[in-house]
Amino acid sequence: MIERLILFNFQSDKNTKHTRVRNMLLRRAAAALPARKTPLHCYRRLGGSYRALSGSLLLRDEEKRLPHRVQDERDEAKADTDLAADGDSAATKPWYLNIVERPAQNMPLHQQEIVFPANSPKSLETIATFLRDKLGLSDVLIFDLRDSQDEQVTAASKISDFMVMATAKSGRHGHKSFIELNTLLKQEFKTVGQVEGNISANELRRRQKRLARHTNLSKSMGSRTATTRSGSNLESWYMIDCRLDNIFVNILTENKRQDLNLEELYAPPDQKHLYRREAPAEDVAPKEGDDNVLAGLKRLAARNQRRYFTTVPARVQIIDALSRQDFDLVLNVVSASKMDSLDILKAANQTLRSMPYGVKIEGESWITFLDEVWPLAPYSQDFWSTRLELFKLLNCAAPGQVNVDRVFTGYLKFKLASGESLTKSDLVEFLQLVETNLSENSHVDYEDLVAKNKCVLEALKLYKGLDPRLILDSEVMCLLLSTLSITQSGSTSTLRAFYEMVEFASREFSQEPPVPVTATVLRILADKQDYARILRFWEKSIASSPEKDHRPWPLFLDTVASTGDQEFAKKVIRDGHLLWIKRNGVKASPELREAIERLFAVADPAEVAFKDVKEFLTVE
């Protein structure tokens, strides 16, 4: 029995030292058991003879066992030495401290590389590395919201500089992660973060009970939210304000991150398409050969799926589609959204202004789109100003498709046909557009000048029954005079209507012509080098009373001097045109003296021929 017990205790031990101890114990047990056997009851009566016999027998047994005993003593001494050595090593280092270092597992989690923004603080690197290496969060992304160029400004870009996104394996993992992150902030940076989305178990049960009391509300909200035993949601989202360098951390479960798609919201405008999700394909009707039961299950599963939605505003989608001139997509977005027509028109104007140089503009398609989104009854002037601006942009980007005639038809005639009254600003904007087309186009010729003036004449006819005196406005008259002439290769060409307008202006403003009208006439005649008409126009406006000569003399003298023609300047002096300054008592202002100096510098650079006249005019 003892031998079995010894073998049972040492059966799984492979240590050599322990094997010696086991063998020694077995030999001792085998030697001790025969010696301890009790003699029979019959031999006890023999007395001394028995003791002598037993002594002799024991002596013989001892002689036989003497070699074995010596070997046992040697084994015992060696076993004691081994046990003492084991005891010393165990005393210095306990067995539970012998921990084997496991090699680091080569998992994809440790291979993920985090891209940090330029000039990011050291704290951001510490937090992002802690999320990846210590907490085991995956798909760590960092968005730089400093100097965001996104047209759709969000609250996150106003209060944060860096937005960190990370994925947790479960709701409990996310719950534990934000606790560990808060601990890091306390220990390393001496700050305490603020978390949103951490709903306790009691609060969650309270909400579920509230929903259960209202049956209809509970049905509309769907099934109860799945929670773990610790009270954390299976699908959760924790947003932590680190209160450190404007860093915000979002910890989401995988399904929650896919549903919210926050990357599209925080990404720069040129990277939003990388995170944009496509709309799910529409269900295909089952064929006749399909199993109706399976088809019904498919439809039921599709109906119970979460509805697709996007975080991109409709305005941003419209601008993106218009920049690619995908008008079908724009109309689909417009029909699906509830944007106001005015906002859509402003988005179109903004897109045209930001179009890169060299992109071919489809002018007719833009006008068709404008007519599609135009409201039936515009109630404010903003609609018409936005429409006019759109036509002006199209004329600038595609003058071959949207010319002056197209603008006249699409805006002036369209507005009048819609029951709206034309205003002075409408005519001024149209005349400025015509003048720009004539002055900035280097390939315009006399025929183009005639064609554009026919369009101007049609525009004036629209105002004939509205405000006939509008043509006498100085701003309108200056623009009309500018549209009647063109300058090509240093030479100016004018229509006959220009001289008729000059005669009309001289007749209507015989007493005090407006200064802008006078300046426009003098400029065009000087460019044309029609000096005789310059003097004729200037003399027609001489007042009969000396006290009423309010003509812009500095302007007239500067016009003569700017021609650089010495003979023309001498003619003005010799013919006595400057003497009207003294005759009519025109005040010699500093501007007038400077104009006289410039004129005499052109006519008499040596100051010999007209020195007396110059002194007479400049002396008060």
UniProtKB/Swiss-Prot annotation:
The keyword Magnesium does not apply. It is a peripheral membrane protein. It is found in: Mitochondrion inner membrane. Keywords: Membrane, Mitochondrion, Mitochondrion inner membrane, Transit peptide. Residues 66-81 have a biased composition (Basic and acidic residues). GO terms for cellular component: mitochondrial inner membrane. InterPro entries: Atp25 (IPR040152), ATP25_mRNA_stabil_dom (IPR025210), NT_sf (IPR043519). Pfam families: mRNA_stabil, RsfS. Residues 66-85 are annotated as: Disordered. The keyword Membrane applies. Probable mitochondrial mRNA stabilization factor. Belongs to the ATP25 family. This is ATPase synthesis protein 25, mitochondrial.
